[in-house]
A protein has these predicted regions:
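C-terminal/domain-edge helix-coil "capping" segments
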Residues: 94-189
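Glycine-centered flexibility motif
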Residues: 57, 88-90, 179
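Mixed-charge, low-complexity intrinsically disordered segments
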Residues: 37-47, 77-97, 131-148
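N-terminal segment of the mature soluble domain
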Residues: 1-76, 99-117
Length: 189
């Protein structure tokens, strides 16, 4: 869930917002229903005024559909840590790496052919540290135990967004290399 919204944002911001024209398809049912309401309202007003109804312009169509999804989330790809304890006083650190993988493909609307297909991965890093004390005091009759720690986890949403943006960029490069589109160079002034 949410991958479509991140893909739309990546497409709309690629090349400063000039590389892709994105047509709404995720909420197409809502869009079509709203257009029917507008059309019906215009027909009623025009009929009451004895005029022809004002037409609603055509929807934007796509020559290419870009779709895909999150195809993998692998946990504990790499884990580790270290620690030491002396006379009941210790310190430790740990880390873990997960990987999210996304796949995006460009499909020709005219032929149904998959023109381009790319995958991108992003590592998600988690790490933490802790310190502790475990000691008997007062002639070994009282136990003192203290632990403290902190952990940091990279945002999974950020990782998915980064992987999608990398996949869109790779899609642009592959499409350019295969002649599906050209990238207009900005003029130096």
């Amino acid at each position: 869930q949410g991958g479509v919204e991140l893909l739309i944002d990546a497409l709309k911001t690629a090349g400063g917002g000039t590389w892709f024209r994105v047509a709404e398809r995720q909420g197409l049912d809502h869009l079509v229903r709203e257009r029917q309401i507008i059309r019906s309202g215009r027909e009623e007003v025009a009929k009451a005024l004895g005029e022809d109804p004002q037409n609603l312009g055509p929807m934007l169509f796509a020559g290419m559909i870009i779709e895909g999804g999150i195809i993998g989330y692998d946990t504990n790809i790499k884990t580790g840590g270290r620690g030491a304890r002396l006379l009941g006083i210790g310190k430790s650190k740990r880390y873990q790496q997960d990987v999210v993988t996304v796949s995006i493909r460009a499909v020709s609307v005219l032929t149904g052919e998959v023109l381009l297909n790319v995958q991108a991965k992003k590592t998600i890093l988690s790490y933490g540290g802790a310190g502790d004390i475990f000691r008997f005091v007062d002639n070994a009759t009282t136990l003192v135990e203290y632990e403290d720690g902190v952990g940091n986890n990279e945002s999974v949403t950020y990782a998915v967004r980064t992987a999608i943006e990398a996949a869109v960029l790779e899609l642009v490069y592959q499409g350019h290399d295969r002649g599906y589109w050209t990238i207009k160079e900005e003029e130096n002034e």
